[in-house]
Design a protein with these regions (language model features):
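Bacterial Sec-dependent N-terminal signal peptides
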Residues: 1-9
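Auxiliary tRNA-acceptor-end handling modules of aminoacyl-tRNA synthetases
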Residues: 9-272, 290, 305-315
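Zn2+-dependent metallopeptidase catalytic core
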Residues: 37, 271-299
Length: 315
């Protein structure tokens, strides 16, 4: 939900977290009313460089992190907990000892600019306008030149800055200036010394805790998610492997074949041309055969994104 008053005032966004954009200063002010509450933070590129050999393409996802805001003195810190080393013991002190034995990562620190009874306001502009995706590093590693972020040529991009009930989205225009090397950047950039992309930040609400982990089976052909559980019995492996999978439950658990409570749906960009669009739908729907063998009916769908749907809304 967005409300705007005038050019000289603020544009307010109401959603998973409320924030405002000041038209005069160009700053984003975020309101935090749930400290120490975990959510997902994802960065990506909403506009890329255009050369596949660079690997900086439109829509490329960066890191996905579980994070939370916490207060320390006059600061709000964005912290990424260590989820690789855990203890699932019924003993609180054992869990606490393992938690304190391994490092966390503070991703950013913010000064508190306003405090109310139930919330804090912080300026997150500097957090957004930074090279979170590692563009300059990728350019350097690919021997394409030495670039640094030029903040005077970077700004918040409101076209893709939105708020929804379960997620908030921020988009920024970033310009990197430097000296290109080779032809990879020159071939796709009007002025190779000034390379401009758009970087996206997503804050997403986590689902409920009803998801059930499943041990990894190497026959699945998938990659495992690995954690080290210090509460495992002494004769068991410290390393625990779990399969990365969709959350899928039968609507009628007692039936041999049942529709799912919620199907898995992959959406195709409605700008995809034919015959590519039809081929993607037909090919993707073949997966339903595998799900039917596992006892599910119409559990996997490939659909064209509806014209009135916003792809940034996680719902």
């Amino acid at each position: 939900l967005v409300s705007s008053f005038s050019f000289s005032q603020e544009t307010d966004y109401e959603g998973f977290m409320n924030f405002s954009y000041n038209n005069d200063s160009g700053k984003i002010i975020l309101e935090i009313n749930k400290l120490d509450s975990e959510f997902m933070y994802i960065n990506s590129l909403s506009r890329g460089v255009g050369n596949n050999d660079l690997g900086l393409d439109r829509g490329q996802l960066g890191n996905s992190r579980i994070v939370y805001f916490t207060r320390r003195g006059n600061k709000i810190l964005l912290i990424q907990p260590n989820l690789r080393y855990v203890s699932n013991s019924s003993n609180y002190l054992e869990n606490k000892a393992v938690k304190e034995a391994f490092a966390r990562s503070v991703l950013f620190g913010f000064d508190i600019i306003e405090k109310t009874k139930d919330s804090y306001k912080i300026d997150i502009t500097s957090f957004l306008i930074r090279d979170a995706h590692g563009v300059s590093q990728r350019l350097r590693y690919s021997n394409s030149g030495s670039y640094t972020l030029n903040k005077s040529m970077s700004a918040i991009d409101l076209d893709r800055t939105k708020a929804f009930p379960k997620n908030i989205e921020f988009d920024v225009l970033l310009t990197f200036t430097g000296n290109p090397s080779g032809n990879l950047v020159r071939s796709v950039t009007p002025t190779a010394s000034n390379l401009t992309v758009n970087q996206h930040h997503s804050f997403v609400e986590l689902p409920d805790n009803n998801y059930k982990k499943r041990k990894f089976d190497p026959r699945s052909g998938s990659n495992p998610f690995i954690v080290y559980d210090y509460s495992t019995p002494i004769d068991d492996k410290l390393e625990q492997r779990f399969i990365v999978r969709h959350r899928l439950n039968k609507k009628y658990p007692k039936q041999e074949i049942s529709e799912p409570v919620e199907p898995i749906v992959y959406y195709i960009d409605n700008g995809t041309p034919e015959p590519v669009k039809s081929a993607l739908i037909e090919g993707g729907n073949w997966w339903n055969q595998a799900f039917e063998s596992a006892g599910y009916k119409d559990a996997f769908r490939i659909e064209v994104l509806p014209e009135d749907a916003d792809p940034m809304d996680v719902r």
